[in-house]
Curated annotation (Swiss-Prot):
Subunit structure: Homodimer.
Phylogenetic lineage: Bacteria, Pseudomonadati, Pseudomonadota, Gammaproteobacteria, Lysobacterales
InterPro entries: LexA, LexA-like, LexA/Signal_pep-like_sf, LexA_DNA-bd_dom, LexA_repressor, Peptidase_S24_LexA, Peptidase_S24_S26A/B/C, WH-like_DNA-bd_sf
Listed name of the protein: LexA repressor
GO MF annotation, one: serine-type endopeptidase activity
Active site positions: 133, 170
Key words, A-Z: Autocatalytic cleavage, DNA damage, DNA repair, DNA replication, DNA-binding, Hydrolase, Repressor, SOS response, Transcription, Transcription regulation
Superkingdom to which the source organism belongs: Bacteria
Pfam families referenced in this protein's UniProt entry, alphabetically: LexA_DNA_bind, Peptidase_S24
Coiled-coil intervals, chain numbering: none
GO biological process, one term: negative regulation of DNA-templated transcription
Catalytic activity annotation: Hydrolysis of Ala-|-Gly bond in repressor LexA
EC number of the protein: 3.4.21.88
This protein's encoding gene: lexA
Length: 213
């Protein structure tokens, strides 16, 4: 997949910011740097870069852009112990709001090894819950939830969703002319997705792990 001049320039900006600042730019910063009217245009180009294999994006992080391909392989990766077929080795990628949406900006290189039986479908990563808006679904503050990476979800499923650059876990409700994200705690109000917001499904909730605390 060939990159456009704009996409090549965005890739160069990402590499430069990682090199100079140690962190990638946010979608808002990319939009501002290239004169886009909003983050939707930046999101479009980032999706193209990801499809081309030039970057990968880490769900659950506001600055979750990572270089891929030759640039990524230049960094030495730590050796990993083999994992049995009946267990999962899952990365803990950040935090997700079970409350008001938050910028999910806490990265982690931690991994958790656990039995596959805890999850259905099989998760791709874990996120740490912050808040209690999903209390009545048995999801509590501090839980680690498994997330199955997908862009597709049905009304009535619990999803991890991104609104602009914020991440939240909620019950998805798709109406005739609107999308809402519903809490499972009467102390919280539903979130209605507005037409001008950058909204995407990051994955499906597929189980949880409750650390000892």
């Amino acid at each position: 997949m060939d990159l456009t001049d704009t996409q090549q320039a965005i890739l160069a900006l990402i590499a430069e910011r990682i090199e100079t600042d140690g962190v990638p730019p946010s979608q808002t910063e990319i939009a501002r740097a290239f004169g886009f009217k909003g983050v939707r245009a930046a999101q479009y180009h980032l999706e193209a870069l990801e499809q081309a294999g030039a970057i990968r994006r880490v769900p659950g992080q506001a600055r979750g852009i990572r270089l891929a391909g030759a640039a990524a392989h230049a960094r030495a990766a730590p050796a990993e112990e083999p994992v049995r077929d009946d267990v999962l080795r899952l990365p803990v990628l950040g935090r997700v709001a079970a409350g008001l949406p938050i910028g999910a900006d806490i990265g982690s290189d931690d991994f958790v090894v656990l039995d596959r039986v805890f999850f259905s479908p099989s998760p791709d990563y874990l996120l740490k819950v912050q808040g209690d808006s999903m209390r009545d679904e048995g999801i509590f503050n501090g839980d680690l939830i498994g997330v199955h990476r997908t862009r597709d979800a049905r009304s009535g499923q619990i999803v991890v969703a991104r609104i602009d650059e914020e991440i939240t876990v909620k019950l998805l409700k798709i109406g005739k002319d609107r999308i809402r994200l519903l809490p499972r705690n009467p102390d919280y109000a539903p979130i209605e997705v507005l037409p001008d917001q950058d909204f995407a499904i990051e994955g499906l909730y597929c189980g949880l792990l409750r650390p000892n605390r």
